[in-house]
Amino acid sequence: MSLSSGASGGKGVDANPVETYDSGDEWDIGVGNLIIDLDADLEKDQQKLEMSGSKEVGIPAPNAVATLPDNIKFVTPVPGPQGKEGKSKSKRSKSGKDTSKPTPGTSLFTPSEGAASKKEVQGRSGDGANAGGLVAAIAPKGSEKAAKASRSVAGSKKEKENSSSKSKKERSEGVGTCSEKDPGVLQPVPLGGRGGQYDGSAGVDTGAVEPLGSIAIEPGAALNPLGTKPEPEEGENECRLLKKVKSEKMESPVSTPAVLPIHLLVPVVNNDISSPCEQIMVRTRSVGVNTCDVALATEPECLGPCEPGTSVNLEGIVWQETEDGMLVVNVTWRNKTYVGTLLDCTRHDWAPPRFCDSPTSDLEMRNGRGRGKRMRPNSNTPVNETATASDSKGTSNSSKTRAGANSKGRRGSQNSSEHRPPASSTSEDVKASPSSANKRKNKPLSDMELNSSSEDSKGSKRVRTNSMGSATGPLPGTKVEPTVLDRNCPSPVLIDCPHPNCNKKYKHINGLKYHQAHAHTDDDSKPEADGDSEYGEEPILHADLGSCNGASVSQKGSLSPARSATPKVRLVEPHSPSPSSKFSTKGLCKKKLSGEGDTDLGALSNDGSDDGPSVMDETSNDAFDSLERKCMEKEKCKKPSSLKPEKIPSKSLKSARPIAPAIPPQQIYTFQTATFTAASPGSSSGLTATVAQAMPNSPQLKPIQPKPTVMGEPFTVNPALTPAKDKKKKDKKKKESSKELESPLTPGKVCRAEEGKSPFRESSGDGMKMEGLLNGSSDPHQSRLASIKAEADKIYSFTDNAPSPSIGGSSRLENTTPTQPLTPLHVVTQNGAEASSVKTNSPAYSDISDAGEDGEGKVDSVKSKDAEQLVKEGAKKTLFPPQPQSKDSPYYQGFESYYSPSYAQSSPGALNPSSQAGVESQALKTKRDEEPESIEGKVKNDICEEKKPELSSSSQQPSVIQQRPNMYMQSLYYNQYAYVPPYGYSDQSYHTHLLSTNTAYRQQYEEQQKRQSLEQQQRGVDKKAEMGLKEREAALKEEWKQKPSIPPTLTKAPSLTDLVKSGPGKAKEPGADPAKSVIIPKLDDSSKLPGQAPEGLKVKLSDASHLSKEASEAKTGAECGRQAEMDPILWYRQEAEPRMWTYVYPAKYSDIKSEDERWKEERDRKLKEERSRSKDSVPKEDGKESTSSDCKLPTSEESRLGSKEPRPSVHVPVSSPLTQHQSYIPYMHGYSYSQSYDPNHPSYRSMPAVMMQNYPGSYLPSSYSFSPYGSKVSGGEDADKARASPSVTCKSSSESKALDILQQHASHYKSKSPTISDKTSQERDRGGCGVVGGGGSCSSVGGASGGERSVDRPRTSPSQRLMSTHHHHHHLGYSLLPAQYNLPYAAGLSSTAIVASQQGSTPSLYPPPRR
């Protein structure tokens, strides 16, 4: 609370700004108000104490206030006391308002007051600033009044900062404001003087300063809970104050005399409370304006954060005790007041182990892990964080320790001391909260990120944290929840942590488990966590993480990021916290997660530091991405866990969804699995994982691990998808199991892979077998190697963000893998920073390369058969890519099958698990391809297609690892969040709604459908002949996923024909385009995968023939990767995001499930229809394909196109979902991108962004992330797609013209921005292409908008919209509108130009947006 006041005073924004606190206020349980009131009561009590002290001093409390000025004057001189002075100022403020009351409470409470008062205000006024839990709890209610006055007074500072009125009040009250500035002399105005002196900046109102001063540590700790953010938020003054307080606090000892004088003068309160303050957060409001509570040696500011294993006795007030074993308390420690929710360890194993001797050991571990306890620096904030953590934890009831911890805990409570003390047990407890095991490794941090999405539900606080890896960073501190306060129940026997570098001792096994899950499982992923931000989406993974909450949960889980899926939100249940946290955004998840307990823990793990929580979180976040966290208690605990593990800070990333969404971004993301899981039936788990990704670096990585399990269960989840909560539960449970498996797996990716495999096997025996065959032993082996590499990579290179994305990616992949174990394997393996990479690299690439090189035929047949079987099977269907693989033979199969899962996950989620997996792997691969393939494309353009894919595989494998950090950060992060979105587009109801309400959408949809039908007919016939209905169905499924791609596919088919007509060279290029067209659409969709798209684009640009070969090869291999990758990513972003949105809500999940089936039916039916229609086009298509591509290209391309055509067909059949999604996606996308961050990714998931996945996360990130994520890719991808698109579009408009322009631009952009620009320019130039391609693929964003608008505006509308959506990905809001509306058409070139410029700039935008 103090923090609050600090925020209040320090933060001009105090009253409201305490968004953190507000968030605290929001506490899901409503404990916020309770806590606030309790704080107020505490404050009153303490005020009484202080007043007594004051009276002792000889100043009645009222007088104290009135006299306080004089007292304060005395105190004023005390610079050190100023911290207390801050409080005293509070008092003064109080005195201003409440002359009598404020003395004790005020001075001490200034922060408190600010906090308590604010708290009350918040509670009452809704003053979030009151978060300063420090004194808030302690500050008397009078203090509250005073706080208000104080706030006014303290506002002085604040006034400067924000509330001048209060300042004025304070000034009025504190006549000596002028003297405030006098450090030693507070005489002029006790109130102002002190503040002034304390806060040089707030000469007038030291309220904030004084709170800081009075809290010397409190400002940082209590005040800073909010203060940390407040430092940032209150920032100018608060920060300064904090710093001053810190320095002065340090000086405080020197100032102590002044402080003592304050005690003497103002009240003994200082004396009274001095010791209590130390003991009780009461901070003895040393009302004596000079309440120095003298920076006692015991003050954290002076002492620094309490070491984790420290056993402490806390004095406090019990605000509430529930029958379910939850205790809400305000405790004073080191003169800082912490509000926390304590859980009965007999009932809540997941709660931070109260028996952990070194509850903060996790924090320390975090530190060791690399986050270095980001919070620690702001040692004060930690409490807040802790509180927040507990809040996040999902101490649903007033877990709101956040109140005590100050809502800003997540990010704000970065102060170690604050966080630390409570951390002592909290951290551990929180960590334990994940059920200790794997749930909360530092994944939670990532998850937190993802949770960001999910945290959305938590409120900005969590979101803040989630959305920012840094917030997550502080999370660790937050984790420590004041609630835990005395959690470190001494245990007779201390259990030593077996970890080599860990010397933590825990009294309770849960503490150890929590610690291990958190610190050590995270250790591998911690770096990831560090780099990572979470969902998240769910971004995505974020985004998927991305994701988001409630819906978020979906986002966070699937939408979980929604947040991301981010995915950021956590459930109240302790175990749920992780998942809850992930889903926390989803209030639902809260309880479900809590119900899930261990499973949830796993999920929570995904959400939290653990893989499980991470997954959820990532996804949520995502996308990655955010439901889990909101599980209040669980969520809080978990979130704290998430936060706790510096992973989140690590993950400051990311979304992931997983984020990621995962998200999703999300989420992200949770960045971010959860998100995906929620988002799509198939990808639901993945989403959640991603979200626990969305959007969820380290956590995401872990989420990824759980993801395999999730993926294994995706189908199960799919059914669960309908009930987002149930699904999340399942996902969480599965994730939990996965995570638990992965917990160990984290260290051993092999295990992970196995785990992933096992779940996947369960999920898709065929898919898994197929994957196994495809990947063969090499896959597992490579997977492990890749995992290891990824782990190392994420630890070193990507540590912070990459892991999260990885997780997001992994989550997604894993989700994807429900059908394809390999993907999960990869996901699992990739778990770390290399989830996608590993997948792509090890399984996809390795398999493709191994299968392709060693046994293409083998792969082909195996894959073919497997693919067919898979297709036949629901999961197999998801594996439609295997069919394409058969088409593309070894490579395509490898990639398709491999990617397909991703793909499936990406769009349909459950529908195309393999597709999604493909997306994941492809996203990674594209990224990987970006470098290798770009190089290869250029260098090896002439090399055979096969060689190139192989090379791509091999070279990209390492590249992936190398790029993994980027990829993961970007792709995974995005995936985290993006994943969340992947489902969004599927929403039938939304589609229907749009159709009914949005004429433009309906028109576009109809156009798209028609276009799709025609093109699908053209290709469909061919494909049917080629692939057969089944393959086509699979393709359709994939098409769904790539529905944005589908238009390109459609475009491609016509384009191919036209291109072929254009000329052999051109035809060839178009051939490549078609091949790429297929890919490109996907690339477009997965703009985030710039590598591949750009590479393809470059290759195409470099050599049409080459491109043909490469396209054909790449198509099978890279393209497959691209398609799956980009498309999936894009799909995640565009489709998944909308889909996630759609599914952000349970309805979404149902939709996914029903849509899956419905799509299947539609696909079959439409496939048949298209067959008849296609027959006409087929010849064209065949000729086109044959002409366009090399022999392989024609076959693989055709196959691809076939599969893709079927996708268009699917698009047509699924047109409602798909087309709607295309149109819908743009809208949804725009939505996602606009609001998806929170709703989607954070939401959430990521929504990835579910982060959405992140993303930064899924939400915006989902689209933004998408843009940033695939920003490079976006351009390249789009260009690629555009290229492919142009083939199609060009055919409609001017193929040759488009191609020429394409080439022109390609060369232009090539030199300019080869990877992205090329494609982008091509794509843009390829306006015509954009028509079909644009509609089909986002890549047409620019091109479709520009070229297509003239040629096929109607058709382009949806396409353009998609493109715009893609564009949106790059430029969240900008394209959104154009995409949504026919602006692009109307905008024409300008829009295209903008898109081009945006896409061109996307790369630059890309990283930032991603983050």
From Swiss-Prot:
Residues 1-26, 47-190, 353-484, 517-659, 679-963, 1005-1125, 1153-1221, 1270-1367 are annotated as: Disordered. Interacts (via N-terminus) with NIPBL. Interacts with INTS13; promoting association with the integrator complex. Changing residue 36 to A: Abolished interaction with INTS13 component of the integrator complex. This is Zinc finger protein 609. Residues 377-401, 423-437, 549-563, 679-700, 798-844, 1286-1296 have a biased composition (Polar residues). Residues 897-908, 952-963 have a biased composition (Low complexity). The gene is ZNF609. Induction: Isoform 1: Up-regulated during neuronal differentiation in retinoic acid-treated SH-SY5Y cells. Isoform 2: Down-regulated during myogenesis. The modification Phosphothreonine is found at residues 381, 746, 823. Transcription factor, which activates RAG1, and possibly RAG2, transcription. Through the regulation of RAG1/2 expression, may regulate thymocyte maturation. Along with NIPBL and the multiprotein complex Integrator, promotes cortical neuron migration during brain development by regulating the transcription of crucial genes in this process. Preferentially binds promoters containing paused RNA polymerase II. Up-regulates the expression of SEMA3A, NRP1, PLXND1 and GABBR2 genes, among others. Residues 726-736 have a biased composition (Basic residues). It is found in: Nucleus. Residues 1328-1337 have a biased composition (Gly residues).
